[in-house]
Design a protein with these regions (language model features):
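A mid-sequence, solvent-exposed acidic-amphipathic segment
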Residues: 184-185, 189-195, 199, 206-218
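Phosphate/adenylate-binding glycine loop and adjacent helical scaffold
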Residues: 1-196, 243, 247-250, 303-321
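Accessory, usually C-terminal, subdomains that scaffold auxiliary metal cofactors
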Residues: 5, 204-320
Length: 321
């Protein structure tokens, strides 16, 4: 019997967490930490309407598929020209929203043709900045892949792709990870460790945007894991659930890039994902049913607070977050 994608994610990350040599989970602190989380604050997450193209039907679905195709670049964000008071993610989302409003929604054919110079213009970036040139090239590559995939398999229809998932977030993931830019899988000690961060996040974003209806109706959202990036692990480290060795902390605080696919980088993501699975289990056992997606929103938004933003988090230049 074929193991489902989300079971593969959980199993791979559990294996890494149990054998990790760089990152450790403070399992003993999890029950108290879980009990202290402000769960009520996470019950009704919502997209910021200033930074997301909401309430436009099929064009909103197209917006989120497009946004999540390029929902990466945190390792480049120190070089990103950001909107005042906005993070890298909200800057990118806000620029894409402005393009959809002021020009027109991008079609699959548009995505096939887009290049790095177009991305530099859409996201209002400085083409003389070498890391940003690299990021805009990666954005163009990811958008080209999405456009070609939609054109070849769904007649260029964004909603055709979503409909093919048949109200299953996991099925949508299966469709998305056929594109290389979504195939978020690492190798660790000979073990394949899938994360599929952006593929999972696409389903969650659509569910939020459409209030669980139409293109946002997925019957298995409770099966999603967290969306393993560099912010949720950072929050868990600051909150003393994850422990990093002194040498790694020093590298991160010095702004040194952590190589994509390195043992440290994989362990950071995998241990964060597994730690949230343990937090979820502790909450469920205490009579507070919650899913990993909701915990991700809570922890990610906690990471926007000044306390967390003032402490450097790991930076990795990758297509996946």
């Amino acid at each position: 019997m074929r193991i489902k994608l989300l079971e593969q994610v959980r199993a791979g990350c559990k294996t890494v967490a149990e054998q990790a040599t760089h990152i450790q989970i403070d399992v003993d602190r999890i029950p108290a930490y879980a009990a202290a989380l402000p769960i009520s604050e996470a019950r009704r997450p919502a997209h910021d309407p200033e930074c997301h193209y909401l309430n436009h039907g099929d064009d909103t679905a197209a917006f989120f598929l497009t946004l999540d195709a390029i929902n990466f670049g945190s390792g480049y964000f120190p070089h990103l020209r950001k909107h005042t008071g906005r993070s890298g993610y909200f800057t990118v989302a806000g620029c894409l929203t402005a393009h959809f409003k002021e020009n027109r929604p991008l079609s699959a054919r548009d995505l096939i043709r887009v290049n790095a110079a177009d991305c530099t213009r859409i996201f209002a970036q400085d083409p003389s900045n070498a890391p940003i040139r690299e990021l805009m090239g990666l954005f163009a590559r990811a958008l080209n892949e999405l456009g070609a995939y939609l054109h070849t398999n769904f007649g260029g229809s964004f909603t055709g792709l979503i409909a093919a998932a048949g109200t299953s977030a996991e099925r949508l993931m299966q469709l998305l990870v056929k594109m290389p830019c979504f195939k978020d899988v690492a190798q660790w000690n000979g073990v394949e460790v899938p994360f599929f961060k952006r593929a999972q996040l696409t389903a969650a974003d659509l569910a939020l945007a459409f209030n669980g209806k139409g293109p946002g109706r997925f019957e298995d959202l409770d099966h999603l894991t967290i969306f393993a990036d560099n912010l949720v692990p950072h929050v868990l480290r600051v909150d003393r659930i994850l422990h990093y060795p002194v040498k790694l902390r020093s590298r991160i605080e010095a702004g040194e890039l952590i190589a994509a696919g390195s043992r440290e980088e994989i362990e950071i993501r995998a241990c964060a994902l597994h730690a949230v699975e343990l937090i979820k289990a502790a909450l469920n056992e205490s009579g507070q049913p919650i899913n990993a997606m909701t915990l991700d929103f809570l922890l990610w938004n906690r990471g926007q607070q000044p306390t967390y933003k003032s402490i450097p988090r790991h930076r990795t230049r990758t297509l996946f977050y």
